[in-house]
Amino acid sequence: MAAPRSWALWSFCGCGWSRAVSGCRLPGLRSSSPRGPLGARLLSQEKEATETHFGFETVSEEEKGGKVYQVFESVAKKYDVMNDMMSLGIHRVWKDLLLWKMRPFPGTQLLDVAGGTGDIAFRFLNYVQAQHQRKQKRQLRAQQNLSWEEIARKYQNEEDSLGGSHVMVCDINKEMLKIGKQKARAQGYKAGLAWILGDAEELPFDDNKFDVYTIAFGIRNVTHIDQALQEAHRVLKPGGRFLCLEFSQVNNPLLSRLYDVYSFQVIPVLGEVIAGDWKSYQYLVESIRQFPSQEEFKEMIEDAGFQKVTYENLTSGIVAIHSGFKLYLR
């Protein structure tokens, strides 16, 4: 999700939020260094003000960041409920398909950007844990002489149950991250999971750090999509994979007309009734219409340096999963 370009980096370390300072930062975090291989970039306040879109409204780039932040700050508490209502629960299937397409291997280091409420992170942890448990069972069957105590020890180690896999959830909105942490606590997710407040356009991570980068229903809210894609490329290891789940352009004319009616006449009403917020959901609908087509977004991903870029339409193109690989050092 886009937001003002000046922000304080915070980390969640078990007890609460703490400002990350020099000499006290999570492994792999950058200490406000230059852009590296992407080249030095000026701070936002030094940039010439340019215009962009906020839904169908034309605003300055700086203004858009603030407006998008306010939208997600406003909808955070009802975000998951509204996702279920707006999509009739189908968003859960789309996210499951994203994980199926990812098929993470043991030890996968995942960065989930704009993933504040944890939907992708929790699915990832469930997937790798199930995968590791299947591997353990095969090993146990091959070692018939193990005692019950040895078997119990193998299953009691929660960190080991993930096979070394880890997910870092990065979001620019503190309220969204707050909801995600509450869900993690309620559902018992602890191991292999960390939360970082950060901007998709200026990720606070070292180069070549992650195996997979995911962003689900977030990149259309970024002010500079090209910069977010370049950052995704930077933080991925050579051989790493970019996966984006995002609303796209419907490829069925009849469904497209029905979808427009539902989007503009029903979703904002649901937003008002359930979340008490018509304007935020009006923006979300408009932002979908402003997002590039499947082919245009594919070209943007390729321009950022990714190779073997493909996309798959889901539900007649209402959403699409774009995939690309970082196959060389930049």
From Swiss-Prot:
Transit peptide: 1-42
Protein EC: 2.1.1.201
Membrane topology note: Peripheral membrane protein
GO CC annotations, alphabetized: extrinsic component of mitochondrial inner membrane
InterPro entries assigned to the protein according to its UniProt record, in alphabetical order: SAM-dependent_MTases_sf (IPR029063), UbiE/COQ5_MeTrFase (IPR004033), UbiE/COQ5_MeTrFase_CS (IPR023576)
Binding site for S-adenosyl-L-methionine: T117, D171, D199, A200
Compartments it resides in: Mitochondrion inner membrane
GO biological process, one term: methylation
UniProtKB keywords: Membrane, Methyltransferase, Mitochondrion, Mitochondrion inner membrane, S-adenosyl-L-methionine, Transferase, Transit peptide, Ubiquinone biosynthesis
Entries under PANTHER family matching the protein: 2-METHOXY-6-POLYPRENYL-1,4-BENZOQUINOL METHYLASE, MITOCHONDRIAL (PTHR43591:SF24), METHYLTRANSFERASE (PTHR43591)
Name of the protein described by the UniProt record: 2-methoxy-6-polyprenyl-1,4-benzoquinol methylase, mitochondrial
Originating organism: Bos taurus
Lineage of the organism: Eukaryota, Metazoa, Chordata, Craniata, Vertebrata
